[in-house]
């Protein structure tokens, strides 16, 4: 007997609780210890942002830093020498740069979204120095507190306004794409507006979902367009790493097909806009089929998304905290 389809809120919670094991080391150039400082190990939420870790990382590496005056907001992260954009959620960064194979088995996708590793509960001890045998291999990152890469990253500030404003602006943009106006986010109460950001910072699913439900219209076909961004990373063997971001407007449904004379075709009802139809429209050379990933596959939240999945349903349950559906293109084979 087939398992019942999880309610959207259950899938949302699984996505929200997905975590990635991290092993964060201090940049050797900034470390006063000859054989390097101990790494900081943590299972961190996919939907969260790396700068939230900076205060605890600054405290953890305090005795190892050459520059004892370095401030937490001066911190930035890199992977294999590539500065990581702090306004991207961790899950997106991982899908872009880690090189890990996305989940493809239908039987394990739900489990993967539920916990890339087991979700850490509020009362659990801080897992900054333990890696148990058999646990997933952590993603190895470096944290830096000097030599800010101004060409790649906007500087953070001591008050946290820069990252706050970047997040809220992204929420506003998603709201405008969905509704043709940013009225919903602009008319949020002051309490809900600050509560949204606080829920993201504290990884509070209950409060986040309550406020998100105000912003995102309920029921089918209530979106004017889907907030969708497609990320095209450079090939692994590329000499110069690069990232192309493609954004376009996609309504939740496709109008009935018309024949060459302009008369209605066989399809008289609008068809759902799917992952495959949107990718075929944007990147036909990579996605020549709307139903089968021939040359490339769409990756979201660490899993390969079915090409036939309706775009609106996917964004409702698997979008990131800012309301955007961020799909990474991964080559087949």
UniProtKB/Swiss-Prot annotation:
Q: Which residues cross the membrane?
A: none
Q: Give the sites of the cross-link named Glycyl lysine isopeptide (Lys-Gly) (interchain with G-Cter in ATG12).
A: 172
Q: Does the keyword Ubl conjugation apply?
A: yes
Compartments reported by the entry: Preautophagosomal structure membrane
Q: Does the keyword Phosphoprotein apply?
A: no
Region entry Disordered: which residue ranges? 107-133, 256-275
Out of the domains of life, which is the source?
Answer: Eukaryota
**Which terms does the UniProt entry file under GO BP?**
autophagy of mitochondrion; cellular response to nitrogen starvation; piecemeal microautophagy of the nucleus; protein transport
Keywords attached to this Swiss-Prot or TrEMBL record, sorted alphabetically, are:
Autophagy, Isopeptide bond, Membrane, Protein transport, Transport, Ubl conjugation
UniProt lists compositionally biased (Basic and acidic residues) regions at 123-133
Q: What membrane topology does the annotation report for this chain?
A: Peripheral membrane protein
Q: What spans are recorded as compositionally biased (Polar residues)?
A: 258-275
This entry's Gene Ontology molecular function terms read: Atg8-family ligase activity
Looking up Gene3D superfamilies in the UniProt record yields: 3.10.20.620, Autophagy protein Apg5, helix rich domain, Phosphatidylinositol 3-kinase Catalytic Subunit, Chain A, domain 1
Pfam families with a match to the protein in the record: ATG5_HBR (PF20637), ATG5_UblA (PF20638), ATG5_UblB (PF04106)
Q: Name one GO cellular component term.
A: autophagosome
Query: What does the PTM comment state?
Result: Conjugated to ATG12; which is essential for autophagy.
Q: Which InterPro entries match?
A: Atg5, ATG5_HBR, Atg5_HR, ATG5_UblA, Atg5_UblA_dom_sf, ATG5_UblB
Q: Give coiled-coil spans as residue ranges.
A: none
The family note in this entry says: Belongs to the ATG5 family.
What function is annotated for this protein? Answer: Involved in cytoplasm to vacuole transport (Cvt) and autophagic vesicle formation. Autophagy is essential for maintenance of amino acid levels and protein synthesis under nitrogen starvation. Required for selective autophagic degradation of the nucleus (nucleophagy). Also required for mitophagy, which eliminates defective or superfluous mitochondria in order to fulfill cellular energy requirements and prevent excess ROS production.
What is the name of the protein in this document?
Autophagy protein 5
Which species is the source of this protein? Ajellomyces capsulatus (strain NAm1 / WU24) (Darling's disease fungus)
Recite the lineage of the species: Eukaryota, Fungi, Dikarya, Ascomycota, Pezizomycotina
Q: Which gene encodes it?
A: ATG5
